[in-house]
């Protein structure tokens, strides 16, 4: 059976820390979607490991790790991340596998990603992309012109000729769209001819890999990237990523049936953050937002960009839960709220004076909503490193209880500090 960790807001909730905790007792860790456009750091002992594309289960020496079919892979970044982990003493090459059906990200995808973003910014319609080529790769995938891993690693000489033809056709189409941008396709093809050999040992039929693991009753953890509010279908479109970041992306990205899912863990930051553009109803463009940003060290691992900050939004979480069906929650970074005398939580939206029954799909409406807040007294004491739920201040427990009651989902873990072991587990 599979347990799944998903982001419930706009990303950066702290999913990696929960995955790290759960990885101690699993056999397989799988990434199902996204690429190297997200990131987190895991600390083991005194060593920091940075993850962007590779599964976090690599820190467990007994865990096999799969980059699934729904992931898009920039091969140079794949090897750079792997070599960075190995340089820090992590022996993981024999435990890492890549789906033969995953699509490849090329340098021209990254170039055109930045060109597209620059084009949009002139009309003040910038998405806030990371520039990693993720969107353009999913675009070529959807248009059936993309190139998959098996196209690259197939040892048949005819397959390599087909790869080159597909590649040059893609480059030509991009240059027709964006003009003759500075780019050397021959140089990239020469690199990929070498990657044919170096990537091949990692490649597996991921559908067979997953179903053999399920049949053997192995403990499987699926590591979602990004978060529900960035989902291509259910997020704040068009200010979203280009993949299915919810529970649907787990099934399609790994080729597993719904009945194999046991638990869906929703990771929730105790307040709300967002990177990039798009409406953000509970955003605080004031001292509150600045404090959350400074105390919470809200800067992206992948881009280094400052994150926009605001109060917890339960309208977002209710919507997120209705799609992903969380069996329990992990509330992260509760300690960031330690010094607030008063804490607010968004509990409803009003538009033109009327309360909305659900999260609006139209961003014109979302940008105009009035947030209805409920106020809570803060606990104004340091909770860093508290190990038992019972030892939390009463006001902190009241805050958490309100979240549980509103969402009708139990809280199973609470983050109480930045350290790896600063996570308490609550009986549910």
Swiss-Prot record:
Q: Which E.C. number(s) belong to this protein?
A: 6.3.4.4
Name the cofactor(s) required for activity, per the record.
Mg(2+)
Sorted UniProt keywords:
Cytoplasm, GTP-binding, Ligase, Magnesium, Metal-binding, Nucleotide-binding, Purine biosynthesis
* Biochemical pathway: Purine metabolism; AMP biosynthesis via de novo pathway; AMP from IMP: step 1/2
Q: What class of enzyme is it?
A: ligase
The record's annotation in Gene3D superfamilies points to: Adenylosuccinate Synthetase, subunit A, domain 1, Adenylosuccinate Synthetase, subunit A, domain 2, Adenylosuccinate Synthetase, subunit A, domain 3
Name the residues that bind substrate.
301-307
According to the lineage, what is the superkingdom? Answer: Eukaryota
Q: What is a single Pfam family found in this protein's UniProt entry?
A: Adenylsucc_synt
Among SUPFAM superfamilies, the record links this protein to: P-loop containing nucleoside triphosphate hydrolases
**Localisation per UniProt entry:** Cytoplasm
Q: Where does IMP bind?
A: 12-15, 37-40, 130, 144, 226, 241, 305
An annotated GO cellular component: cytoplasm
Spell out the NCBIfam families in the cross-references. Answer: PRK01117.1, purA
| Family affiliation | Belongs to the adenylosuccinate synthetase family.
Q: What does this protein do?
A: Plays an important role in the de novo pathway and in the salvage pathway of purine nucleotide biosynthesis. Catalyzes the first committed step in the biosynthesis of AMP from IMP.
The name of this protein is: Adenylosuccinate synthetase
Q: Which organism is it from?
A: Candida albicans (strain SC5314 / ATCC MYA-2876)
């Amino acid at each position: 059976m599979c347990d799944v960790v998903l982001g419930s807001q706009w990303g950066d909730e702290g999913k990696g820390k929960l995955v790290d905790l759960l990885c101690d007792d699993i056999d397989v860790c799988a990434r199902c979607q996204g690429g190297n456009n997200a990131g987190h750091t895991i600390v083991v002992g005194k060593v920091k490991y940075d993850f962007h594309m590779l599964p976090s289960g690599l820190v467990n020496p007994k865990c096999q790790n799969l980059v699934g079919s729904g992931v898009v892979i920039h091969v140079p970044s794949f090897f750079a991340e792997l070599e960075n982990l190995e340089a820090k003493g992590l022996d993981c090459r024999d435990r890492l596998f890549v789906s033969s059906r995953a699509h490849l990200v090329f340098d021209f995808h990254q170039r055109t990603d930045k060109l597209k973003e620059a084009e949009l910014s002139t009309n003040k319609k910038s998405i806030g992309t990371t520039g990693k080529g993720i969107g353009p790769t999913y675009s070529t995938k959807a248009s059936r012109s993309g190139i998959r891993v098996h196209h690259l690693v197939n040892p048949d000489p005819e397959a390599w000729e087909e790869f080159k033809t597909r590649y040059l056709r893609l480059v030509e189409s991009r240059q027709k769209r964006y003009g003759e941008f500075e780019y050397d396709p021959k140089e990239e093809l020469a690199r990929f001819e070498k990657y044919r050999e170096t990537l091949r040992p990692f490649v597996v039929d991921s559908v067979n890999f997953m179903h053999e693991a399920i049949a053997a009753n192995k403990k499987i953890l699926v590591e979602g990237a990004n978060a529900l509010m960035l989902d291509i279908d259910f997020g704040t479109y068009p200010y979203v990523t280009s993949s299915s970041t919810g529970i649907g992306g787990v099934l399609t990205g790994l080729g597993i049936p719904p009945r194999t899912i046991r638990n869906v863990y929703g990771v929730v930051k105790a307040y709300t953050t967002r990177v990039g553009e798009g409406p953000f109803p509970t955003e605080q463009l004031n001292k509150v937002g600045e404090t959350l940003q400074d105390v919470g060290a809200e800067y992206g691992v992948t881009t280094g960009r400052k994150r926009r900050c605001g109060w917890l939004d339960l309208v977002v979480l209710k919507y997120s839960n209705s799609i992903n069906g969380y069996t329990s929650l992990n509330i992260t970074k509760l300690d960031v709220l330690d010094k607030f005398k008063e804490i607010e939580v968004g509990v409803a939206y009003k538009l033109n004076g009327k309360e909305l029954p659900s999260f609006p799909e139209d961003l014109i409406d979302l940008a105009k909503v009035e947030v209805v807040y409920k106020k809570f007294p803060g606990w104004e004491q340091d909770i860093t490193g508290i190990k038992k739920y019972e030892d939390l201040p009463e006001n902190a427990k009241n805050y958490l209880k309100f979240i549980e009651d509103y969402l009708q989902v139990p809280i199973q873990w609470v983050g109480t500090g930045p350290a790896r072991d600063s996570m308490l587990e609550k009986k549910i």
